[in-house]
Amino acid sequence: MLCRKWKKSIAHTVCSYNNIFGIAVRDNARMNTIATTSAAQAQQEIAEEFAFFGDWTERYQYLIDLGKQLPSFPEQWKTEEYRVHGCQSMVWLVPSGDALSMHFEAISDSAIVSGLIALVLRVYSDRPAQEIVDTEPQFIATIGLAKHLSPTRSNGLAAMLAKLKAHAAQALA
């Protein structure tokens, strides 16, 4: 990748961002379709994408842009039934499907949290319930996200993952 060889500059940032954003748009377009890779492969792809960025300012901007690419979320789903408690911002998570293939829709009123949702959906949505239950979110540590989230965002992310896995466990019961 020619862009990665450039010294840290605005051109480098734009080039890296455009390369990654193209990947993100394609992957987010797949969020509402059958997943073509395993959860482990999705985590690896996320790690590779985040490796392109030089600093956390770029990574946060990427998260914000991922959140903007989430599919529209119907207002009628923004109910207490679907709300994820434990998040400082408002987050809603709607499960569908069965143990063979679970699909999740989610949204937040926070731009960065919506980006986190996009990553979580990429790893966990459109997968068998057993794979969801068995998959640990290794990408969080791999990309250094745990060190760069506030405690309230970390708690919210943990609450979202717990609720998602609880839905999968319920589908298996």
Give the location of each predicted region.
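N-terminal intrinsically disordered, cationic/polar leader segments
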Residues: 36-46, 51-90, 97-98, 140-171
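Conserved interaction-surface patches within small, structured recognition/assembly domains
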Residues: 94-110, 121-124
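Glycine-rich phosphate/pyrophosphate-binding loops
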Residues: 126-143
